Structures are given as structure tokens and as C-alpha cells.
Design a protein with these regions (language model features):
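Class I S-adenosyl-L-methionine-dependent methyltransferase catalytic core
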Residues: 1-53, 60-76, 82-310
């Protein structure tokens, strides 16, 4: 069910009283799961997002992500001056005010990072491209469930780490709702605590790592950006060892898949590419919204999923 238009004469206080969370019925959520499981042709438009309703519904703590300055979307929604500005923007620029637009405007007005859910169909697409009916995918940074949904929808087993207790619990709630417990192994630990040597081989590693301190998910000391105080130190002491450990788990024909981009003065995509190249893994293709590999060095500031192989 699409969200209704807002009252064109809504006041700022009335706008602030609206529940900005995504809320779907059980029927809508199950239909979205079926839609994801049936996808075999993958569109590149931003409105193509099977399975996303499940992520949006089950992770309300998404709105508590803080910027490096310590402000979250939830904080902004309670800021009268900011919300009044957003309301006036909408009234001046649009004939109809929609909650979806208001959410985007709050991110912009609040100077927040453009946080997003990983599209479940991207992980499904990676798996279907392997041609394997069965396999194991490891995700060192589980996050909001998108990679889990795509993996299980394709018939593979999903193994992941998630240090944030609230996110871990929400993942388990989603697992129980869909009845996919036998297809998921989830650890409430940071990626660096995972026992890579004992795990055995996997077919694909797929993750979207923290963008250093661009998004602060929790004040928990287990978060990697609390342990390494500069981007370069974080890359050397956390990201590169993580990639090395993940690649060590791969079968000979395995794929190392990373959703990253460069941001501010932090060359995250460049670092991920360079680390893989040192391990003799090269980028074979990318996934994203109309993202050709031809100009890989000029698109690394875009949010892409890079697929590396030997």
C-alpha cells in the first residue's frame, strides 16, 4: 500500500507528529518476499527494489544512524526549525506533499549522510550469475538484512557477523518472520572476532563495510571506527586485514564482492580495489544503477557493488 499524500495545509507541529517509520502489513511483506524470490531479470532503475519493504519494516533503528557530527534523522525530525524549513520547501516547490519526499528533504536539510538499505536483488543477482544452485555466502557486516534476503532467496546459505545488538535482534525477528532459520547462521560479534580459519571455504563474500565514521550506527566500542581514529589507520588495521581474511575463505572460483564508494577525502572504493589487486583479484563487473565497468576509475565516487575474482 503506497503512502497517502499529506494534508496540503499541514502545520509544522502536525508534520513532526507523523510517524516517519515504514509500516507494512504482513500480506505486503510476504508478497515482497515472493517477488524477490521470483526475480530473474534485473532492472537498473532506482525504483526496482524487490524485498526492500522487509528491510524498511524490520529495522526501525535505521533512523538512529548518526552523522559524524552526532545528529540522526530521528533528531532532525524533532527539530522544529528544520522541519518548518522542510515543510515550506515542499509547499513552495510541489503541488502535493508526500512523506517519501519529506524523508529525503530531512536528510538534505539536516546535512546527514545519504544512508540507504542494500538492495536485496543485488546479492541475488551475484549468486544467480555464478550458475550455482547451492552455495555459501559470508557477510562480515550484516547490516539491514538486504544481503541476507537476496542470498536466501537464491537458495544459498548465509553466514554473517553483526556486532550491533539491536540490529542483530532485528535480523533474528526478520529470520523468524520468514521462517528461514535453517538458511542463516548469524553471529553477534564484530567481523574481526570471527574465526576465519575454522569456517571452511565459501563461494562468495559479499558485504557493505562501514564507511569509516561517515555513519555512526551505535556508540558500542565494538564498532571499527571507535578503534581506529583516522581513515588511513582504519584501512591499514581493519579494512585490509578483513579483506585478506575474507579472501582466504574463498574457493578457487570464489567471488569477493564489496559495496563501497569514495566519500569526502576518504578513498574507500580505491582502497578496496587496490587491496584486491594486491591479492591478484580483479574487478570483473559492477552492480548498481546503470553502472558500466568501462570507466571504473571515474565512477568510484558512486555507490557500486564491485565483484572481484582471480
Amino acid at each position: 500500500m503506497s503512502e497517502p499524500a499529506l494534508n496540503p495545509n499541514i502545520t509544522t507541529q502536525e508534520l513532526m507528529a507523523i510517524d516517519y517509520h515504514y509500516n507494512y502489513t504482513e500480506k505486503e511483506l510476504l508478497a515482497d518476499w515472493v517477488k524477490l524470490k521470483n526475480v530473474s531479470e534485473f532492472k537498473t532503475g532506482s525504483q526496482f527494489k524487490p524485498g526492500m519493504k522487509l528491510c524498511q519494516h524490520y529495522f526501525p533503528n535505521f533512523w538512529n544512524i548518526k552523522s559524524s557530527g552526532g545528529t540522526s534523522f530521528a533528531d532532525c525530525w524533532q527539530n522544529y526549525e528544520l522541519m518548518d524549513k522542510v515543510r515550506l520547501w515542499g509547499k513552495q516547490g510541489m503541488s502535493q506533499l508526500w512523506l517519501s519526499w519529506v524523508r529525503r528533504a530531512v536528510f538534505m536539510a539536516g546535512g546527514l549522510p545519504n544512508s540507504s538499505f542494500y538492495r536485496p536483488h543485488f546479492s541475488r543477482q551475484v549468486i544467480l550469475n555464478t550458475g550455482k544452485d547451492e552455495g555459501i555466502l559470508f557477510d562480515p557486516c550484516a547490516g539491514w538484512g538486504g544481503r541476507m534476503l537476496g542470498t536466501v532467496s537464491a537458495g544459498w546459505h548465509y553466514i554473517a557477523c553483526e556486532p550491533n545488538v539491536e540490529t542483530y535482534n532485528n535480523l533474528n525477528n526478520l529470520i523468524d518472520f520468514l521462517g528461514i532459520r535453517n538458511s542463516v547462521t548469524l553471529y553477534n560479534i564484530p567481523a574481526e572476532s570471527f574465526d576465519y580459519k575454522s569456517q571452511g571455504k565459501v563461494d562468495v563474500v559479499l558485504t557493505s563495510p562501514p564507511y569509516f565514521n561517515l555513519e555512526v550506527y551505535t556508540t558500542d566500542s565494538n564498532q571499527s571506527y571507535h578503534k581506529h581514529n583516522t581513515f588511513d589507520i582504519w584501512v591499514s588495521n581493519w579494512l585490509e586485514p578483513l579483506i585478506n581474511n575474507c579472501v582466504s575463505m574463498l574457493r578457487d572460483d570464489g567471488l569477493s564482492v564489496w559495496n563501497v564508494m569514495n566519500f569526502n577525502n576518504c578513498h574507500l572504493a580505491t582502497s578496496v580495489i587496490d587491496i584486491h589487486n594486491k591479492l591478484n583479484y580483479n574487478c570483473k563487473y559492477t552492480l548498481g544503477f546503470q553502472s558500466p565497468i568501462a570507466n571504473i576509475r571515474t565512477v568510484k565516487n558512486k555507490d557500486l557493488t564491485y565483484v572481484f575474482a582471480k
